[in-house]
Amino acid sequence: MARIAGVDLPNKKRMEYALTYIYGIGLHNSRLILNAVGIDFNKRAFELTEDEAAAIRKEIQENYMVEGDLRKKVAMDIKSLMDLGSYRGLRHRKGLPCRGQKTKTNARTRKGKKKTVGAATK
């Protein structure tokens, strides 16, 4: 099992899909990485030699922000929006959608479980 950027890649998957298990690398970036290193997309993860795995590690480390660093950057970006007091920051602080969706009936994922209001018993 190849371990790249702190993630164990699934052995049976083709490399172009196996690399997408790393946070911050999608299908497009995985194909760019494999092209840069010169590895066939159809090669399975268990078929990787140690040299090929090292080349992929080097390519990712030099050119991509992945896993913990990327998560930290996203969290810091959201925190800076909240500190600025921008509209998006306020929406993040309140736990509501930031991108203009309606919230009267939907947005249950962001708002959480329904809270019934005004239905008190006598």
From Swiss-Prot:
GO BP: any one term: translation
GO CC annotations, alphabetized: cytosol; small ribosomal subunit
PROSITE patterns noted in UniProt: RIBOSOMAL_S13_1, RIBOSOMAL_S13_2
Composition bias type Basic residues, residue spans: 95-116
Record's keyword terms, sorted: Ribonucleoprotein, Ribosomal protein, RNA-binding, rRNA-binding, tRNA-binding
Region annotation (Disordered) ranges: 95-122
GO MF assignments: rRNA binding; structural constituent of ribosome; tRNA binding
Gene3D superfamilies noted in UniProt: 1.10.8.50, 30s ribosomal protein s13, domain 2
Highest taxon, organism lineage: Bacteria
Stored HAMAP family: Ribosomal_uS13 (MF_01315)
Entry-linked PANTHER family: 30S RIBOSOMAL PROTEIN S13/40S RIBOSOMAL PROTEIN S18, SMALL RIBOSOMAL SUBUNIT PROTEIN US13M
Family affiliation: Belongs to the universal ribosomal protein uS13 family.
Assembly mode: Part of the 30S ribosomal subunit. Forms a loose heterodimer with protein S19. Forms two bridges to the 50S subunit in the 70S ribosome.
Function: Located at the top of the head of the 30S subunit, it contacts several helices of the 16S rRNA. In the 70S ribosome it contacts the 23S rRNA (bridge B1a) and protein L5 of the 50S subunit (bridge B1b), connecting the 2 subunits; these bridges are implicated in subunit movement. Contacts the tRNAs in the A and P-sites.
Descriptive protein name: Small ribosomal subunit protein uS13
